[in-house]
Amino acid sequence: MNRKTMAAVTAMLTSSASALAAPPATTPDQPMPVNPHTDRAALQRFADDRLGVMFHWGPAVLRNQEISWSMSDRAKYESVYKDFNPKHFDANAWAAVAKAAGAKYVVYVCKHHDGFCMWDTRTTTNNIMNTPFHRDVVAELSAACARDGLMFGTYLSIMDIHEDKWNRCYAARTQMPGYPQGLPHIATFTADQTAELLTKYNSQMMWYDGAWLQGWRQSDGPAKVEAVIRADNPKAIITRLGNDVDDYECMEARIGTYRAVPWEMVTSVAYPTYSFNTHIKYKPASFFIETLSRVVCGNGNLLLNFVPDADGAIPPEQQTIAADMGGWLKANGEAVYGTRGGPYYPNTWGGTTHEGNRLFVFVLPDAPDTLTLPPCGRKLVSLRYLTHIEPPNVTQTDAGLTVTVPKDIRGSDTTVLELTMDGDLTGMVEASRPKTPVKIKQNGVPAPIEERTLPTTAPAR
């Protein structure tokens, strides 16, 4: 149903004049984070984008095991570097997969914990230019993203097993043997590599890993690296560097409840696997469409990792996931891009987003047929499904909005309704806040993604 025919369904609405007599209790919209160095416009654009794609790929893929974490002997692990010469790496093809998925930004793992650098760096000889491949992957992918209008971001591990001269990857902080050259060296080394990624490759996002290193958060390392970022690219946004320097919080494989400030969830098409092996098991696209739906209703972004194979190609199964997600977003993207979560808190059945006076209701496949939303202080003017021509069944009374979406209307993916109200939607409807933690399922089974409660206001800095 197009906008011109919206008015045709308004006659189906029933409303009570007294429904708006007393405004509902709402929580006011919260400000953006108060870090004085944050570029607010850049962070707003990030929040508008809602979906990003990540790529883990490097010589370690030849081991057919997880990157870094499979390292039990550094010499054996690093011996594969001399054989790395993939035949089918094409940065344009990678960018095309991100574009097909509906992503607006790309984050590439330029250096994982193993310390191997996928760019032409002056900081170490442990880099891609000293392999038979001898191509600057970061440069090629940055250029491909620019051509496709994708924001380019760079993942950089603070932990560097090669530079730290450790013999293996340590999963527990208590097992780590310390740093031969001390934390100041790690901070300087990380800052120098950060400067290269910002100035040579126009990185717009610095996405760190390894801030859990023993002593890192207690050192001046985060502040030292932040100073480089703010000087070299003040518009770049930062996450996972540690302490109070981050512009937003990113959580791994956890769906947060609603949070007023920007946040991100990162997971993989083959979670818990992030780099390619021949035993990978993929989740279906419907799983990630539902994940994206839950995340955006909680006012967050989803960063979805894809895993190119040893030859540099993205396997067909992953391309199918990207195409299916992109197809859903093509039909429902106006409920995702540029919107904000709320004004209803996410629940087991789904949640809502809004933009101006437009309320988008995300109804998950396993939701009950009928939902009741408490009064939001606005009168319903018109409504439609984003993907069906049938007029929705929605009524408005003193009790709020009653939304009925029969299962024969729904498919295997989230169904979205657009409800146009008589004024802009602001704040959160307190009556919709779940009284107990939300227990979620995905595709009818308990999700391996855990609910995590987040503060609803910006953290004190």
Predicted regions and their residues:
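Bacterial N-terminal signal peptides that target proteins for export
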Residues: 1-7
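Bacterial N-terminal signal peptides
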Residues: 9-17
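Mature catalytic domains of secreted/periplasmic carbohydrate-active enzymes
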Residues: 22-461
